[in-house]
């Protein structure tokens, strides 16, 4: 009954944990061929199908050994990944073979450093030095009969970047790794699901054409409604003009969608409808060029839910199953269909949904990651339209490697990238940015004229403001927003102003649930014309939908000033000349923090040069050009590109070190769960008894705050 017929990749057990007969096991040949074929299909979009196929075939080669057979029967663990890595280098050499070896050796442990030191992980050089029969098990020659390998292997059609050619090879390795690990996961999942007679809810999404049909229907219905809206009052007339302008912007963008794939900008002022315009362009561009999905990348977790909800709405009955919302705070409890919940939960692992809405942290850290769980999705980024919302928010200290990744996606992976913002960063070569983006196409109609038509505020720098000055203005203006640069300043100012009617305080030391309740109260008071004085940190600039007649902003970068201006006269109901954004210099005690000092200094220069229109496209371009010039090497202060260049000749890329260094948010903070209400208390109590806490922790995200790891114990 238990006669051994072959070597096996996976054993099978009954419900009691007893081994089933071999006929239920997955043979190693079956698994290796399946993974090779699936990896090849994943890599086809970027022309690397043959390399991916052979990588898949070799990934578990070390299982062709008695040692691993013993492991399947309860023995000790065995290194089954190094064997395939060694064979790849022996067969295909130190270029393509070595890139394959990184993937094969790391398909469980993660991509290692090529040489030097590794953090609890052997380097590839150390792995390749291991000897068959001594350090790793001897292979049964049966593998050569079951796994057919070509003598030669053509390199994929990789157009290496002229200035950073080795970056292209490292990027390709991560893409190849993605194809391998996703194929390995999926074939293993399919085997065990079949064994247990379980259906796996993957795939079966609506296609982009169906989504575009629903999207266009929604837009056309909206246009019909606004065409019939009254235009009697001044506010109604302004709203009608605004909606006509939004339609013109959207139509113009869609007309540009036939252009060749590559890099685009959408430079539209706040209120110009860039969210729907960018999606309209992306859907048409994808249709014209046979692209596979749209990935919408947002810098703020706080607004990702609102954007994802808007997309579900415009896609109608297809929205819930088409839109994958992938970020740390996503709670699938708001989805109605249980099958859809399961499918999207699985889709978050590899991003195979047609519409992905995610954070910039998730997107870019994955592109530089070393772990299989983070890299698994990468191959599904290829062939996508990628919308970078609020592109100016990309972190300055990682800007150069991020730009290099964007270039790589456009050049070698059939992607188009739309940089979408009201304050377009001057990262093009034509703006003087050294080795910046080239051939970038603007899809908005005449951005300079748009900014004139959509001007809603008057921005002024009013000099230094003492506490007394700020308190006087808060007392004088019943509805106003004051934004400062740190939580201590916000709290201190609030303590002195809280005697005023309708005074609120918002910082990240309040959990999201608490902030959400306060914002609802704030919006209600603003709508009803009641006193509403808000003192907040920059968190309120992150797409929060509030509309004040007056905003004061402590000195910061011009992009932050523009975000603050988006909270003033947001609905365009007041004339711009009566809607003020006042920039001020705080007292020395609350001066600009060091990390914002350069941005604030350059903003002051722009305020001097463009005092008549500080948020004009010319002012923004001048601001970013000067800022990037001053920052220089700090635009890659983790030396990510240097690490690629220094190790490129030998292809000994330090993948593990790069992944560790590429952090868009430094992890000097720790989450603290706040028992804010009965729901939070119930969830916290459930944690004590839960076997799997991942789902509970996601539900608790709205009740967490981030505090420094070195905070006093009184916090906890």
Located regions from the model:
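Interdomain hinge/linker at the junction between the two RecA-like core domains of SF2 helicases
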Residues: 422-475
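Walker A/P-loop
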Residues: 260-282
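C-terminal helicase lobe and adjacent C-terminal extensions/tails of nucleic-acid helicase motors
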Residues: 410, 468-477, 483, 488, ...
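Conserved helicase motor
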Residues: 10-15, 301, 324-338, 485-488, ...
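Inter-Walker segment of RecA-like/P-loop motor cores
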Residues: 317-368
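Conserved Walker A/P-loop ATP-binding site and its immediately adjacent core
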Residues: 291-314, 330, 426
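SF2 helicase catalytic motif II
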Residues: 360-364, 374-409
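Accessory nucleic-acid engagement/destabilization modules that flank
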Residues: 1-225
């Amino acid at each position: 009954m238990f006669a051994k017929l072959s070597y096996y990749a996976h054993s099978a057990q009954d419900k009691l944990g007893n081994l089933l007969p071999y006929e239920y096991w997955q043979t190693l040949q079956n698994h290796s061929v399946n993974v090779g074929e699936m990896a090849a299909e994943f890599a086809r979009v970027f022309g690397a199908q043959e390399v991916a196929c052979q990588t898949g075939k070799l990934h578990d080669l070390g299982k062709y050994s008695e040692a691993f057979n013993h492991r399947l029967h309860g023995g000790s663990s065995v290194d089954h990944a190094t064997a395939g890595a060694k064979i790849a280098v022996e067969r295909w050499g130190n270029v393509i073979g070595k890139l394959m070896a990184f993937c094969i050796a790391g398909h469980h442990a993660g991509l290692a450093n090529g040489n030097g030191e590794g953090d609890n992980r052997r380097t590839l050089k150390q792995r390749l030095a291991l000897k068959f029969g001594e350090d790793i098990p001897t292979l049964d020659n049966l593998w050569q009969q079951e796994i057919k390998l070509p003598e030669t292997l053509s390199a994929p059609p990789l157009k290496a970047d002229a200035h950073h050619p080795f970056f292209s090879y490292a990027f390709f390795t991560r893409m190849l790794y993605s194809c391998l690990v996703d194929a390995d996961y999926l074939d293993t999942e399919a085997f065990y699901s079949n064994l247990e007679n379980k259906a796996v809810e993957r795939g079966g999404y609506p296609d982009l054409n169906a989504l575009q049909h629903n999207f266009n229907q929604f837009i056309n219905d909206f246009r019909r409604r606004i065409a019939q809206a009254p235009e009697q009052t001044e506010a109604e007339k302004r709203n009608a003009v605004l909606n006509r302008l939004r339609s013109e912007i959207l139509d113009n963008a869609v007309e540009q969608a036939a252009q060749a794939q590559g890099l685009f900008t959408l430079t539209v002022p706040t209120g110009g409808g860039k969210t729907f315009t960018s999606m309209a362009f992306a859907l048409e561009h994808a249709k014209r060029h046979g692209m596979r999905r749209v990935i919408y990348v947002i810098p703020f977790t706080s607004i990702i839910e609102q954007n994802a909800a808007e997309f579900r709405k415009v896609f109608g009955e297809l929205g819930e199953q088409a839109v994958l919302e992938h970020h740390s705070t996503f709670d699938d409890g708001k989805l109605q269909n249980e099958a859809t919940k399961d499918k999207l939960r699985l889709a978050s692992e590899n991003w195979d949904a047609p519409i992905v809405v995610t954070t910039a942290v998730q997107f870019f850290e994955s592109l530089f990651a070393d772990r299989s769980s983070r890299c698994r999705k990468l191959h599904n980024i290829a062939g996508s339209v990628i919308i970078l919302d609020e592109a100016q928010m990309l972190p300055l200290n990682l800007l150069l490697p991020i730009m290099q990744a964007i270039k790589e996606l456009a050049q070698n992976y059939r992607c188009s990238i739309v940089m979408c913002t009201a304050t377009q960063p001057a990262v093009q070569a034509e703006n003087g940015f050294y080795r910046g983006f080239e051939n970038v196409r603007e899809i908005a109609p005449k951005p300079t004229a748009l900014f004139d038509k959509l001007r809603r505020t008057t921005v002024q720098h009013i000099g230094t403001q003492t506490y007394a000055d700020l308190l006087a203005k808060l007392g004088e203006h019943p509805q106003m927003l004051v934004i400062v640069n740190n939580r201590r300043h916000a709290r201190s100012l609030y303590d002195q102003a809280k005697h005023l009617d309708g005074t609120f305080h918002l910082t990240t030391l309040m959990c999201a649930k608490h902030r959400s309740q306060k914002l609802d109260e704030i919006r209600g008071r603003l709508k009803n014309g009641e006193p509403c004085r808000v003192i907040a940190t920059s968190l309120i600039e992150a797409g929060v939908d509030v509309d004040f007649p007056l905003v004061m902003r402590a000195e910061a970068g011009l992009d932050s000033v523009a975000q603050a201006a988006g909270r003033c006269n947001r609905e365009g109901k007041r004339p711009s000349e009566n809607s003020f954004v006042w920039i001020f210099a705080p007292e020395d005690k609350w001066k600009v923090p060091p990390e914002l000092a350069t941005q604030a200094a350059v903003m002051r220069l722009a305020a001097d040069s463009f005092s008549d229109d500080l948020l004009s496209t010319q002012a923004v371009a001048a601001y970013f050009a000067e800022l990037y010039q001053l920052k220089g090497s700090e635009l890659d202060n983790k030396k990510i590109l240097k690490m690629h260049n220094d190790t490129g000749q030998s292809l000994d890329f330090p993948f593990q070190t790069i992944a560790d260094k590429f952090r868009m948010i430094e992890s000097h903070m720790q989450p603290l769960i706040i028992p804010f209400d009965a729901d939070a208390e119930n969830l916290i109590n459930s944690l004590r008894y839960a076997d799997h806490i991942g789902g509970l922790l996601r539900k608790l995200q709205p009740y967490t705050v981030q505090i420094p790891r070195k905070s006093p114990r009184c916090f906890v």
